């Protein structure tokens, strides 16, 4: 991906080599990743992965980036922003604890903030329940500030520990947006939910 993003803080500090998953052939069976950190890709069709009723049997195109690590791994805000909303998406296979942060960013990101500013929202999902303690809408967050930790499987929607990070140019009504869409909806979804590497950098 040929982008030169302005300076943003890492959402997860990847301080050692990491594994980039390829889920286009479905989730790997009977294989334990030997790396502490893992990446799940954006704009990836993931057949056989989303099997709960929440996904309606047709949504399998991933429109965020997954940053995997041990439960309790700190999650940081990539820029200065404001808590927009938060809550627990409790359906089986959903996000579990979720925080939405609102940002005013030069968009798309460019050197020297060359582009006009606009509001952009970021979802931080599959968090620990305690990550929501003490939060309030309108609360300011600092660039690089710790805002959450990765949740355990029993609290994060039923997934291995990771944070689903997703950008949105559409303001969420509630602390939830589709992180997986139907393939027929891909074109509009990639407009509404742009590539997180615009702020995360070239992770792969």
Give the label of every model feature segment.
Residues 62, 126, 162-164:
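Histidine-centered active-site/metal-ligand motif
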Residues 2-7, 107, 113, 133-155, ...:
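Acidic, glycine-rich catalytic/binding loops that coordinate metals and/or anionic ligands
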Residues 69, 85-87, 126, 152, ...:
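A residue-level detector for short acidic-glycine micro-motifs
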Residues 56-91:
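Short, glycine/small-residue-enriched coil/turn segments at secondary-structure junctions
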Residues 1-70, 186-204:
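Polar/charged, compositionally biased leader and regulatory segments
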């Amino acid at each position: 991906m040929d982008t030169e993003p302005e300076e943003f803080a890492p959402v997860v500090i990847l301080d050692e080599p990491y594994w980039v998953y390829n889920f286009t052939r479905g989730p790997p069976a009977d294989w334990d990743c030997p790396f502490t950190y893992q990446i799940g890709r954006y704009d990836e069709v993931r057949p056989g992965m989303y099997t709960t009723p929440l996904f309606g049997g047709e949504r399998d195109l991933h429109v965020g980036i997954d940053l995997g690590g041990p439960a309790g791994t700190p999650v940081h805000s990539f820029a200065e922003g404001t808590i927009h909303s938060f809550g627990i998406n409790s359906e089986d296979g959903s996000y579990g604890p979720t925080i939405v942060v609102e940002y005013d960013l030069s968009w798309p990101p460019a050197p020297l903030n060359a582009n006009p500013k606009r509001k952009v929202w970021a979802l931080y999902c599959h968090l620990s329940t305690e990550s929501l303690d003490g939060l309030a809408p309108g609360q300011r967050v600092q660039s690089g500030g710790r805002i959450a930790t990765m949740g355990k499987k029993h609290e994060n929607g039923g997934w291995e520990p990771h944070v689903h990070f997703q950008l949105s140019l559409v303001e969420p009504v509630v602390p939830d947006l589709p992180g997986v869409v139907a393939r027929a909806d891909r074109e509009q979804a990639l407009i509404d939910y742009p590539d997180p590497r615009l702020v995360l950098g070239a992770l792969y």
